[in-house]
């Protein structure tokens, strides 16, 4: 939901989560970020599904204050030994994403992906992959550049456009014109703006 940078993600504290509202959604206060050097803070949307997952995580970890995303000590077999009170280190975020992809593959959630392709995908994942992916998902859903920048706190449109350049064409002027023409396709009717 939030498209947080890794430095923002590891700083999320229980007190920063507001909600849920009557729809089950919430919002996250982001006190400081790369694009907010003055520390004025910003907010991000939290969906009902995210709010539910956060509620479960906080309950399971018995977290009432402090960092939401804490270090977890595990036994050799991978079972949880202890949920610590220390925040995750920013460098661990990318490794967690890689582990999630491997687990999804093991559970058959990535289709017929072979081991070679899996390793190529895992190697390409970084802590920034979520931000790139959220931009691409929004372009694929034909969200506007301005809406994407506002929702995920980007200041430079060139950055967002670079992440979604291949997908942005689907919502561009040419694509919109083609849709209008297809809707008006009857004989020699000229394509024109339809509101």
Model-derived regions, located:
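Short, charged phosphate-coordinating catalytic segments
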Residues: 1-24, 145-150
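C-terminal secondary-structure termini that scaffold catalytic or DNA-interacting sites
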Residues: 177-195
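Catalytic-site neighborhood detector that most strongly recognizes the C-terminal catalytic loop/helix
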Residues: 152-177
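Short, flexible loop/turn elements at secondary-structure junctions
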Residues: 2, 13-16, 32-34, 73, ...
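Mobile genetic element proteins and their domesticated derivatives, centered on retroelements
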Residues: 3, 9, 30, 69, ...
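Short, basic (Lys/Arg/His-rich) helix/loop patches that form interaction surfaces
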Residues: 63-64, 94-150
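Nucleic-acid-interacting cores, centered on viral/eukaryotic replication and modification enzymes
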Residues: 6, 26, 130, 138-141, ...
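Basic, alpha-helical nucleic-acid-contacting "clamp/cap" segments
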Residues: 20-105
